[in-house]
């Protein structure tokens, strides 16, 4: 029926993301396995709410939760290191922290889409790309996509 087709499409568009205060990555992987939805890893949220969990212990499950789709991830830098502002997004991305995140993902040899969350929006993205081109040997496919 048309209603069941709509329901199926809605169900297929649901994903779960770890947050910065309550649901950590372990919680999301557990939920994902029980209701078969993909996990969006928000790395900044993981840093804020890691509960001493090693992200490497969960990446295989996060990546496989997407089945044949490209996994989605979010990356942002904290506004500053004070407890009050650590959870807030910076205007720009800290390139060294981003490179470190890519280095964490590299051993899994898996394509991912990383959404940059920064107050300066496109300007932050293009600054990050310039810094990556200067600091790394990544192979750029287009203006903002690269291979490691």
PLM-predicted stretches and their roles:
Residues 2-7:
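Short, small-residue-biased leader/transition segments that mark boundaries at the very start
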Residues 9-12, 33-40:
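Glycine-enriched alpha-helix->loop->beta-strand junction motifs that scaffold or abut catalytic
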Residues 13-20, 117:
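Catalytic beta/alpha-barrel core
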Residues 17-28, 32:
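Basic- and aromatic-lined ligand-binding clefts that recognize polyanionic substrates
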Residues 20, 45, 120:
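Short, glycine/acidic-enriched loop or turn micro-motifs at the edges of active sites
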Residues 23, 44-49:
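Short acidic, Gly/Ser-rich segments with clustered Asp/Glu that frequently serve as metal-coordination loops
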Residues 30-32, 41, 50:
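Long, repeat-rich segments with strong aromatic
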Residues 37, 48-148:
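Histidine-acidic metal/acid-base catalytic patches
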């Amino acid at each position: 029926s048309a209603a069941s087709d709509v329901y199926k499409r809605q169900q297929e568009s649901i994903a779960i993301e770890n947050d910065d205060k309550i649901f950590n990555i372990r919680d999301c992987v557990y939920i994902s396995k029980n209701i078969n939805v993909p996990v969006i890893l928000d790395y900044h949220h993981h840093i804020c709410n890691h509960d001493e969990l090693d992200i490497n212990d969960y990446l295989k499950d996060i990546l496989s939760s997407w089945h044949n789709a490209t996994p989605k991830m979010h990356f942002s830098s904290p506004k500053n290191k004070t407890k009050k502002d650590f959870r807030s997004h910076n205007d720009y991305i800290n390139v060294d922290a981003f490179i470190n995140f890519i280095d964490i993902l590299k051993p899994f040899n898996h394509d991912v889409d990383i959404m940059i969350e920064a107050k300066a929006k496109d300007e932050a993205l293009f600054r990050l790309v310039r810094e990556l081109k200067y600091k790394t040997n990544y192979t750029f496919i287009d203006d903002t996509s690269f291979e490691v």
